[in-house]
Amino acid sequence: MPLNEKVIGKQYKSDPITISQHESIYYALAYNEDNDAYFDNRRQGGIIAPPMYAVFYAAGPTAQLMFDAEIGINMMFVVHYSQYFEWIKAVKPGDEVTSEGTITHITVKEKGSILGWETVTKNQHDDIVVRAQWEFFDRSAGSGKPDGKTEEEAIPSQFIFDDAMKVRNGQTYIYAEPSGDHNPIHVDDDFAKKVGLPGIIVQGLCTMAFAHKMAVDHLTPDRDPLKVKELYVRFARPVLPGQMLTFKGYAIEKLAEKTKYGIIALNDSGKDVLRNAWCTVA
């Protein structure tokens, strides 16, 4: 069933959310984080919420959109297609944030349709803290017509970093709690198989959080998470619990006030799990 293109431009607004120290710390632990910026209150200025915690506090409009029957999306067949974050100002425990979202596009492809929307999140001072662009892929809404050719991602010969992350068995259950992503494909093996998946798959935003950690650990001075200004990923294939992921980073270009880096993420079979991923670092 095709998605309803008449919803393009439709807007949503979340209720205010107060950032919980307990939950922001829980979120950091849920993707194997070890950066004291998220844990050590003895630091000058205290702790910050992990930038990737925006997957929870900026997702209010997303939750509304998912249950909006007017769109025609079949959540049983939805996977995350791509994600972009721009972090503008630090978010700390105790802050109150509100998000507004707007549906921006619907793209019909052979094997499904892409639903895209953007969100803007502001704090209690009306300062914009995060901008985000989200895309879901509804596998039940394809055209059946072959897609045009896409450009292959250029693979560099030299890398700035090459590091690995072990996906824990049980990672999806741990990540589901603070992120709010309880989609059955992440926590119910039988359900995941019924909708054509090999079993439980890892939340795409958990894989993105791994990539963010790699960028902070290897591309910033003193592992400063506030130096990573943007991160974009497209999800290439499912990540499974127990897999070992390899992340590699390389320089793309020097911009006016920041540098753009590419990120490659591979599973233990050497297949890419993220595609066209990049970040900018101040």
Where in the sequence are the language-model features?
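Short leucine-rich amphipathic alpha-helical surface patches
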Residues: 212-219, 235, 239, 249, ...
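Short, surface-exposed helix-loop/turn micro-motifs enriched in polar/charged residues
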Residues: 111-113, 223-227
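Hot-dog-fold acyl-thioester-processing enzymes
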Residues: 1-80, 143-148, 154-225
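Small/polar glycine-rich anion-binding or flexible loop at a beta-alpha turn
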Residues: 43-46, 227-240
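Short amphipathic alpha-helical surface patches that serve as generic macromolecular interface elements
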Residues: 208, 212, 228-232, 242-245
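HotDog/MaoC-like acyl-thioester-processing domains
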Residues: 1-7, 12, 78-164, 239-282
